[in-house]
A protein has these predicted regions:
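Sequence/structural signature of beta-propeller domains
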Residues: 20-442
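Gram-negative bacterial Sec-dependent N-terminal signal peptides
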Residues: 1-19
Length: 442
């Protein structure tokens, strides 16, 4: 096991990270880690929060792509911009940014869940699809067969889908576009075979298998194997089970009762003793490794459901292996928030969303006060852990949450949303690196 270089005694109080002055993280998004979370920069100044809400490294800029001034889907309430993706393939590839909106029926009057679209060339933003029975739309991904998959993060459905009326939790949907036009919706179908769950992360491998999670404090990780590539109407859903009752080590995918999975996949997973993790949220695949953000995981005490969180790695081989890739106290500090005049310790807490960086690094954003964005290096020494986890950005908007981190075609630009902002103006932003003309590569 990697030596615990970040385990700090309770008496230590630091606001900066010890490596901030010594490290340069290379790649297209080359950066010097920022010194600390935005504890000292927290503000309610609307001018700042609507223009430069992030503390970012030198050599980077931040700008708004779309906010509620050019598209206000839910007047009088936050739009809850959540996940991002672009049309990654096909005609006009890279031109359109799609977003889910994590709005729930508790707001009134409820106008229904929505997917919006931003033309990255013109800046025009519009609703792509909206339906009165959609709740808390969250996960979103562009498929290799040029459709969108999106899903509801719902534990107990208040507005059942008319085509899946017995489902007890959230559903996953597939949006199909008109031929050669990624701005026109041709059809939207519910995909109950992928389970009724509190969905968030969605990932797809080279074989067309789809991975999903259940965002429960005892949530499982799932794999759907379709009968035919690109056809999600039939197939088998599996849940991940680590052998010998452990959380890490050799694992297997266990087939679920498909009738039960379409009603409540959580119950189906529990019936086969699938391994539970504390609030699995987003998923990201890099090569043959699937990463999962575990928001409240305690890697030391599995009974604790209020842990600091961790990043899990699952190898997508014939015999999967499961390990903690980012673990507070091992390769990143624990966070200790400042109290009154006592300074805090900048650290890792409540990881939520993940993104594959342009050079294969894993990007992580927290669901936490002063949401931090971290970058985890690959595990080159093969000990299971990232070889380094570095602080890229931190949010000055304390009541808000950074979410939906995503890289499109431009390797120098990170998309990120800000939801439930102090300003009441939820937004989608781009954080970009200024590339010098003298650079021939990174």
């Amino acid at each position: 096991m990697k030596k615990s270089i970040f385990a700090l005694p309770a008496c230590v109080a630091l606001t900066t990270l010890v490596y901030a002055d010594a490290i340069l993280v290379n790649g297209p998004m080359k950066f010097k880690p920022i010194a600390a979370s935005a504890y000292q920069q927290t503000t309610t100044d609307q001018l700042i929060l609507n223009s430069e809400p992030w503390v970012i490294p030198g050599g980077f800029t931040q700008r708004i792509i779309s906010d509620e001034s050019n598209l206000d889907i839910y007047p009088g309430a936050s739009d809850w911009n959540d996940m991002n993706t672009i049309n990654e393939t096909g005609k006009y590839a890279g031109q359109y940014l799609y977003r889910t909106h994590e709005v729930r029926p508790s707001i009134g009057p409820y106008l229904g869940g929505a997917i919006s679209m931003v033309d990255l060339k013109t800046g025009k933003a519009q609703v792509l699809a909206q339906r009165s029975d959609w709740e808390a739309l969250d996960g979103l991904i562009w498929t290799p067969w040029q459709t969108l998959l999106f899903a509801e993060e719902v534990f107990a459905a208040q507005l059942p889908d008319p085509d899946a009326p017995n489902a007890q939790s959230g559903m996953l949907y597939e949006l199909k576009f008109a031929k050669n036009d990624p701005t026109v919706v041709e059809e939207i179908e519910v995909r109950p075979m992928l389970g009724s769950l509190a969905h968030e992360g969605i990932e797809i491998d080279e074989e067309g298998n789809v991975y999903v999670i259940d965002e429960d404090r005892k949530g499982a990780i799932y794999k759907f194997v379709p009968d035919n590539f690109g056809d999600l109407s039939s197939g088998q859903l599996y849940a991940l089970r680590v052998k010998n009752g452990a959380k890490t080590g050799e694992a297997e995918w266990i087939a679920l009762d498909m009738n039960q999975a379409q009603i409540n996949a959580r119950i189906a997973a529990q019936a086969v003793n699938a391994t539970s993790f504390c609030r699995p949220e987003d998923l990201e695949r890099i090569g043959r490794t699937l990463y999962a953000a575990l928001t409240c995981e305690d890697a030391v005490n599995s009974a604790n459901t209020t842990g600091p969180g961790a990043i899990l790695a699952v190898s997508l081989e014939s015999v999967p292996r499961v390990s903690y890739f980012v673990q507070p106290g091992i390769n990143v500090p624990f966070e200790i928030r400042p109290v009154d005049t006592i300074p805090g310790v900048t650290g890792f807490k409540s990881p939520d969303n993940l993104a594959k960086g342009p050079d294969g690094k894993l990007w992580i954003v927290e669901d936490n006060d002063n949401s931090d964005i971290w970058v985890a290096l690959p595990d080159e020494d093969e000990d299971g852990y990232s070889d380094g986890v570095y602080l890229f950005a931190s949010l000055k908007d304390k009541t808000a949450e950074g979410t939906g981190i995503y890289f499109g075609e431009d390797p120098y630009t990170l998309f990120v949303n800000i939801q439930h902002s102090e300003t009441g103006n939820d937004k989608t932003m781009a954080i970009s690196r200024k590339k010098h003309k003298s650079e021939s590569g990174d």
